[in-house]
Amino acid sequence: MTELDQFWPACLARLEAELSSQQFNTWIKPLTAEAGDEGIALFAPNRFIMQFIKDRFLPRIEELAVELVGELPVELRLGAPTARPAAPVAGNSQPKAKEPAKAAASAPAAPSPAKQAAVKAIGGSHESTRLNPSFTFDTLVTGKGNQLARAAAMQIAENPGDQAYNPLFVYGGVGLGKTHLIQAIGNHVFQKNPQAKIRYIHAERYVADIMRAYQHKAFDEFKRYYHSLDLLLIDDIQFFAGKNRTQEEFFYAFNALIEGGKQVIMTCDSYPKQIEGMEERLISRFSWGLTVEIQPPELEMRVAILMKKAEADSIKLEHNVAFFIAQNVRSNVRELEGALKRVVAYARFTSQNITLELVKEALKDILAAGNRQVTVDAIQKTVAEYYKIKLSDMHSKKRSRDIARPRQVAMALAKELTQLSLPNIGDAFGGRDHTTVLHACKTITEMRASDADIAHDYEALLSMLRN
């Protein structure tokens, strides 16, 4: 093995140690390398990843090249190596999958006449995807809250069955666009290959279908169908909790699809290890591929969502009006779009144009609820109870991590949920300087993107304080 051949495995090992598992699996792992006479070529599977690598990681890769083998030109290309693939990344506990099967799988055997009703009960036509055609990547507004999830989704849509992203587990609060995101994958795959066998299904419907299949003695057909899919998208998988028979059947379906190189995508309202009533063997498998979070949209993204929705529905919406709605409806995309629908309906019923005054009247109950501001005292008390520390620790000078981290979380929550300035927030935390508050907010924002536990804690506290 030449020095160039040894470079990429060594570089991968260094990057894996430096980056979070999400960053490494999403951006670095899909790359392949080919050593040439004068340097090394890195191949990205699509333009989106190639551009992201160029902007964020290529300088570090070039630094490692100099450090590991001396002066080494590194070239970034689109596609795949013509010679041999890069060395595999060690440490993946997932069983080796077969090569991703082409989506044009043969159709399952037709049910016997005696079981036609049962087949209909378990999902209707086998050709039906149950995808909403309006849920596409083009109609999905992207912001900091869903940037990583969208990037992973686009990669999967281009290369379904890729072991690094299989399964994809998307989690986050209610109404944040998880369903839109995973259906965008399904629609993209179907557009590329209409022969692909795709099924989108809500977890509750899957449970009901299993029960019907047993009642109608049609379980063989049910099993044959789900085991033969190219792409399975299951929404709100937390509904499997406590349903042992459903979990057992899904376990076998999951294994059959993954081992066949087929893609499985799931959404949930919480991180896999936080799901109560779910078998450990399933929770373990949920983490085989990539787990990504969707966070509540920031202000700029909320404005963009409103403007895009208004444009799609041919509604004249001024930017200042959208900004006002976005400022006052912060929880999730569903409530944001619901507020816009209420404004539009009010304008039509009263035959008025959509103005700031009309919005204030149409949303007066929402605005009244929003005006009941969360206080810093309430934030400190809630965070202290959540992390099981003393309330006085919020004001103390203690700097141990088990005290400092909850205090930083509380500062970040105070910045998001109150109208206080940074100096005022600092005063409420034992007279700290505004730069300390700013540092705390920045730290927590970065950790929410890289640490699943911190992200989960923050969202849980947000929900508790808002409700």
Curated annotation (Swiss-Prot):
It comes from Chromobacterium violaceum (strain ATCC 12472 / DSM 30191 / JCM 1249 / CCUG 213 / NBRC 12614 / NCIMB 9131 / NCTC 9757 / MK). ATP binds at residues 175, 177-179. Residues 84-126 are annotated as: Disordered. Domain I is involved in oligomerization and binding regulators, domain II is flexibile and of varying length in different bacteria, domain III forms the AAA+ region, while domain IV binds dsDNA. The gene is dnaA. Residues 1-79 are annotated as: Domain I, interacts with DnaA modulators. Plays an essential role in the initiation and regulation of chromosomal replication. ATP-DnaA binds to the origin of replication (oriC) to initiate formation of the DNA replication initiation complex once per cell cycle. Binds the DnaA box (a 9 base pair repeat at the origin) and separates the double-stranded (ds)DNA. Forms a right-handed helical filament on oriC DNA; dsDNA binds to the exterior of the filament while single-stranded (ss)DNA is stabiized in the filament's interior. It is found in: Cytoplasm. This is Chromosomal replication initiator protein DnaA. One of its GO terms (biological process) is DNA replication initiation. Residues 130-347 are annotated as: Domain III, AAA+ region. GO terms for molecular function: ATP binding; ATP hydrolysis activity; DNA replication origin binding; lipid binding. PROSITE patterns: DNAA (PS01008). Keywords: ATP-binding, Cytoplasm, DNA replication, DNA-binding, Lipid-binding, Nucleotide-binding.
